[in-house]
Amino acid sequence: MEPQPKTIEEHRDYLYGIVRLKLFFLHGFLNKHPEEKFADALRNRVDIYRKTSANRGLLNPTEFFYDVEPWVSMECKAGELFELYKNDVAAFENAAFEVFKPSIDERLEKDFADKSGLAGYQCGSIRHEYENRHDPDTIHFHIANAVCPHSIFDDPNHLRDCLLQLCDHVEKDLGATKVACGTWLNQNPKWLHYFPQEWRDHMSAPNTDVHWHYGYWGQFISARGTSVPLFVRSFLQNPLPFQQDRRIIFPDE
């Protein structure tokens, strides 16, 4: 059956589900890392902020309004609930979700209509970062889904063409000889199928330091942009290494 674009009702369910999942994770993370402040974890480990009306921008805003309403009150109340329910993850998740829910609902239509997630993707489902390079010889790239509601793996030529376009652009136009990407997909055989042995040979150490971005959280979102089943909660209690930064080196001519 041909996959259909998600409806606004499905998008609302996705937002509810992913925010609940992030609250579930946050509870366990903070209990394991009591040295980290609740506000820091809420802002940096998960991306609930971007899904609320506190976010005045698009999917990836350039400005953050953490110090004004409505975020101040929501963050403060959620922190109080964590202290109250530090030993009861379900109670915290349910109560904290109700704190954010009205603000999620307020932003729902704007969030559903936002198509900016693919802005700047020069190579279909792949974009490179040229400006923020630490190593001038290496270009890091990011992955999205330009063929939603299909999976990027449905057409075997799609990712191949995206990656070939990336490599051609990086080598000929940007003058670099390496590309790198840190992503949960580096543990997916379907993804690794597109890469030569050099990609595996230049693997760096796995990284389990969870942050808000889709390099981690993307694995919990379906090709249609909906939530994946709730069994992932067991995964989040004992997360495996999700990100492996692997590099491919262009051979000398």
State each model region's role:
Residues 154, 158-165:
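Conserved acetyl-CoA pyrophosphate-binding loop and the N-cap/start of the following alpha-helix
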